[in-house]
């Protein structure tokens, strides 16, 4: 999840200086929220799982989500995918790139939050997952509003709607 959040930080930085229609302000808010969550996740890892690796890790296919032995080091390609580093915007397309990219990013967060709800018994993790679902739903709706303002309304903007509820 930290790698996923790092992607949001990088994407947001491309549009900090954009004023229309509140894109820069939204990007700065997303950056602040994601940075705070990265810090919290780091503190939880140290407190709850001091023996867990500090390098980016993922659950092995079929692995037990409650076992550190089921973790494996993320490949460079996996890290790049989590950080959504597949493309770089141009000056002309960076607003649409950011808004569409954040819908995809938030959709990934919804998938991971539902996964956490399905697998975790930790009340703090479950609360975070529910908070993420509520926040991501709200932001996806705002991102779509901003895209509609620019005359864009593609079917893929709605691909995560089924994940808006618990």
Q: What are these language model-derived features?
A:
Residues 2-166:
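All-alpha RGS (Regulator of G-protein Signaling) helical domain and cognate RGS-like helical scaffolds
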